[in-house]
Amino acid sequence: MGFPPRCIGQKIPEGLHVRMNLETGVTEAKLISNDKPKNALKMIEDESNNFPEKTSSESENRKTSYKNYEELKKDFNELNLNPKTDAEILRELIEKHVDISKQKDRDEEEILTILEDLEFLVHQYDNANDFVKMDGFKTIVYHNLNATNSEIKRETLKLLGSSMQNNVNVKIHALETGSVDILLRILALDTDMSVKYRALFALSGLLRDFPYAQLKFVENAGLSVFSKLFESDNLKIQQKMLTLINDLLQEEIDSKKDTKQVEKIKQYEDIQLRKRLIVHNYCDHLNKMIVNSVVIEANDHDIIERCLGALYLMVDDCSSKLTDKSKDIVLSLRNLYRKLSQNESVDGDPDYFGTLYDLSNAIVQRIQKIKVEL
C-alpha cells in the first residue's frame, strides 16, 4: 500500500504525518488512526474552497454563540479532534500489535497495517529512538521474524531497516540485541527470495557507516552467506549485495582521507574486507556478474555500472583472476560507451554515458598497466 502525495501549498490538518520520499522526491502524507487501521491512508484535499466567505449576519451570530472551555473540550473529545503525539501513537500501535499477536486467530491483515504505520513513523529520528525505548525490537521485530507468514516478515524487515537509517542509537541497539545473526540466518535459510531481499535492505541499513557492525558481520560468516547467494541465479539479490559491498569498500577508502580520524581508520583496517572478499571468491563472482550483466541485462546500464564500479574498486586484486571473456566485455563496453557518450543522453544527462566510458576506460588502463608490471 503506497502513500498518497501532498501538493505544495495544501493545508495540513492536525495529527497528519508528513515525510519526504527520498526515492521519488515527493512529499507524502499519512493519517494514522488506531480506530480504523485499514483506512489509515487519506488523500489531503485542498480545503480552501470548502469554506464560503462569512456574511455580516453570520459574524454577528458567531459573536453570540461562543461556548465555554468545558463545552469545547467535550465537543473535541466527542469528535476525536485531540491530536496525539507520535510517541503516543507508537505506544498504542505496539500495544495493539501485542494484543493481536496473543489471539489464537490473529488478524494478519491488521498486523500488516500496524507494521506499515510503524514503518512510516520510524523514518523520523526521534520516533525510531522511542520505538527502541518502548521495546519495539523485542515485542515486534524479533517476534515477527519468527513468523511463518512471508508478508509479515517482509514488512517487519522493512520496519527494521527504516528504523536504522542514519540512526546510530538504533544501530547500536540492533547490534547488541543480535540483529546481525538474525539477518544472516534469514539470508542463509529462508526460501522466499523476496524475504531475503528485504533482509539485505535491513542489513545494509545496519552496516553502512558502522565499522564495528561490519566487523561482526565478517566475523559471523557474513561473507560466506554472501558467497552462497552469489552462486544463486537471482540477479536482483546479487545486485543488492554488490551495491552494499561497493559502499563498504568506498567507506574504507574515504576513511583514510581524514588522517585525524585515527580510531576510525583502525576500525576499518581491522575489518580487512578486501582480503576477506578475495578469500570468499569475490573475484570469481565478479567475473560471473560482468558476463551476466551483458548477456542477461544487456540494456540495463544501471546494473552494468554497478558491476564496473565493483571491478574498479577491486581491479588490483582481481585483475589476474579475470577471464578473457570478462576482459573482452570490459573492452567492448568501453567502445560502446564512447560512441553513446557522443550521440546520446539518458534522462537529460548528457554525461551519463561519458561517466561509464571513463569508468570502463580506467579499468582497461589499469589492467593493461598491471599486465606490463608483471
What are these regions (language model features)?
Residues 129, 172, 212-215, 275:
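Recurring C-terminal helix/loop segment of individual leucine-rich repeat
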Residues 135, 221, 230:
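Residues that form ligand- and interface-recognition hot spots within folded domains
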Residues 132, 272-274, 327-331:
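Extended intrinsically disordered, low-complexity coil regions enriched in Ser, Thr, Gly, Ala
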Residues 124-125, 166-167, 210, 317-318:
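Short loop-to-helix capping motifs
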Residues 2, 7-73, 102-119, 148-162, ...:
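Alpha-helical solenoid repeats of the armadillo/HEAT superfamily
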Residues 75-152:
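Internal amphipathic alpha-helical repeat/solenoid segments
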Residues 132-185, 193:
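Helix-rich alpha-solenoid scaffolding regions
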Residues 93, 97, 139-142, 182-186, ...:
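Buried hydrophobic core positions in alpha-solenoid tandem helical repeats
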